[in-house]
Amino acid sequence: MTKKTQDLTSWYDQLLVKAKLICHGEVKGTVCFLNNSWGLWMEIQQLYNDAIANKNQLSAIALTKFQPTTSFCYQVFQVQLPTLSFYSEYQKEKTHIKGFNPELFLINQVGQKQLNDPLVLRPTSEIAFCNLWKKQELSYHDLPLIYNQWTQVFRAEKNTRPFLRNSEFYWQETHGLFVDQSQSEQAAISFWNLYQDLIINKLCIPAFVGLKSESEKFAGAKNTWTIEAIMPDGQSLQCATSHDLGDTFTKSFTISYQSKTNQKMTPSSFSCGMSTRILGAIFLTHSDDYGLVLPWYLASKQVKLYLFDKNNNPKTRALAFLVKDFLEKLKIRFSFIEINNQLGKQLLKGEIEGIPLQMIVDNEKTINIFNRLTRLKTSLTFANLQTEFVNLVNNYHTEMYRKANDLVEQKLARVQTLKEIEQAFKNKKAVLCTVKLTGELEQHLKTKYQVSVRCVFKKSDVTQNCPFTNQPCFDSVLIARAY
């Protein structure tokens, strides 16, 4: 493989093939998910579904990087909505919601019949959920009403890269109705916190979290909360977003609920989503020149256990089955392979696939353990494995985050003068600075430097002069190129 530090684009393309993650589809921007990548997406689904069901508490072997500021206390129903809708619905929303103009795939003909109102392949589902809610007779007893679906969406993208920007991709989207905007805003923040826990704690991705600027937030949203990760090329990757939509969509679709006083009231809504783009973030952040490196909580197989016994020693076999039983009791996701040749080939395959820990039992006394993250081997007796396994996993988890954070720091500049900022842009780094944030400044950044404001943090308590306008400023922001 091309070295990651020499040519990130070539390395990434080769990684996807070597690790058997995808095959390219026939249509530009589409891919065939192979079992190695789809298995990871299924684990993402499990992590999120457990989280919204309040089953996904961090175990004792996790080191918490982020503590949610609000408790999660919502009931979420799993649903599946149609892929097709009418083009006229999107045209209607363009007149109601400034900026709501997703790039659409249109179907103009069904069989031999030309359609007067073309069909649209789902680009997002705000409209679909609004049409669903409009058909339901709702009262204040029914609210909040929150739905989640796992599905695919379609965007007519010009420049595509697998996982990072696709014409067809998979995601989860959660949509909810509430009696007023204070509740929809609180829900948006709660789900944003949930994403942070998953992305930072479970996936070990260092992230910058905050609000989207006015020009970058979701069209129609009162506010959009984002989670941004800096990739090895200095670009920012949007990992997940959560939107307080207020009554923007519900008023447009004349959705109502019956209040306690039997009045028809307009509810507020929110939506949030995370897509298969998160897999691209994982691959870029953690993987190396030898193949995938996967977070412990994500790996479809956390351990591969090999019984390598050429001499048919019953004591060696007994040790292997002791380890197998031990892993089963801990509910570790693992595979057990009995082989008597080509062990090196199997270990190499496991390395490319990013198996966190590979264990080899080839004698009656010790277990050899290969750590994918450090690429180091250790030997433990079964007694030591029992006492040290939690530390093995915890160290893997925390070291993965540390390494990822060190790489982010190399691609990040905390600067304030215009000269420093321009030098950082020249060096293809992301920038943390304080500015006077205006629409004019955002357009200037895009036009002159081809960068954008990715994230807005809490306002600074210290008055500084904006490096671009020389006016007093309080807005702490992350500025970067974006995927």
From Swiss-Prot:
<keyword id="KW-0436">Ligase</keyword>
<dbReference type="InterPro" id="IPR006195">
    <property type="entry name" value="aa-tRNA-synth_II"/>
</dbReference>
<dbReference type="GO" id="GO:0004827">
    <property type="term" value="F:proline-tRNA ligase activity"/>
</dbReference>
<comment type="function">
    <text>Catalyzes the attachment of proline to tRNA(Pro) in a two-step reaction: proline is first activated by ATP to form Pro-AMP and then transferred to the acceptor end of tRNA(Pro).</text>
</comment>
<dbReference type="GO" id="GO:0005737">
    <property type="term" value="C:cytoplasm"/>
</dbReference>
<dbReference type="InterPro" id="IPR033721">
    <property type="entry name" value="ProRS_core_arch_euk"/>
</dbReference>
<keyword id="KW-0547">Nucleotide-binding</keyword>
<dbReference type="GO" id="GO:0017101">
    <property type="term" value="C:aminoacyl-tRNA synthetase multienzyme complex"/>
</dbReference>
<dbReference type="InterPro" id="IPR004499">
    <property type="entry name" value="Pro-tRNA-ligase_IIa_arc-type"/>
</dbReference>
<comment type="similarity">
    <text>Belongs to the class-II aminoacyl-tRNA synthetase family. ProS type 3 subfamily.</text>
</comment>
<keyword id="KW-0963">Cytoplasm</keyword>
<keyword id="KW-0648">Protein biosynthesis</keyword>
<comment type="subunit">
    <text>Homodimer.</text>
</comment>
<dbReference type="InterPro" id="IPR045864">
    <property type="entry name" value="aa-tRNA-synth_II/BPL/LPL"/>
</dbReference>
<protein>
    <recommendedName>
        <fullName>Proline--tRNA ligase</fullName>
        <ecNumber>6.1.1.15</ecNumber>
    </recommendedName>
</protein>
<dbReference type="InterPro" id="IPR002314">
    <property type="entry name" value="aa-tRNA-synt_IIb"/>
</dbReference>
<dbReference type="InterPro" id="IPR016061">
    <property type="entry name" value="Pro-tRNA_ligase_II_C"/>
</dbReference>
<dbReference type="Pfam" id="PF00587">
    <property type="entry name" value="tRNA-synt_2b"/>
</dbReference>
<dbReference type="GO" id="GO:0006433">
    <property type="term" value="P:prolyl-tRNA aminoacylation"/>
</dbReference>
<keyword id="KW-0067">ATP-binding</keyword>
<dbReference type="InterPro" id="IPR002316">
    <property type="entry name" value="Pro-tRNA-ligase_IIa"/>
</dbReference>
<dbReference type="InterPro" id="IPR017449">
    <property type="entry name" value="Pro-tRNA_synth_II"/>
</dbReference>
<keyword id="KW-0030">Aminoacyl-tRNA synthetase</keyword>
<dbReference type="GO" id="GO:0005524">
    <property type="term" value="F:ATP binding"/>
</dbReference>
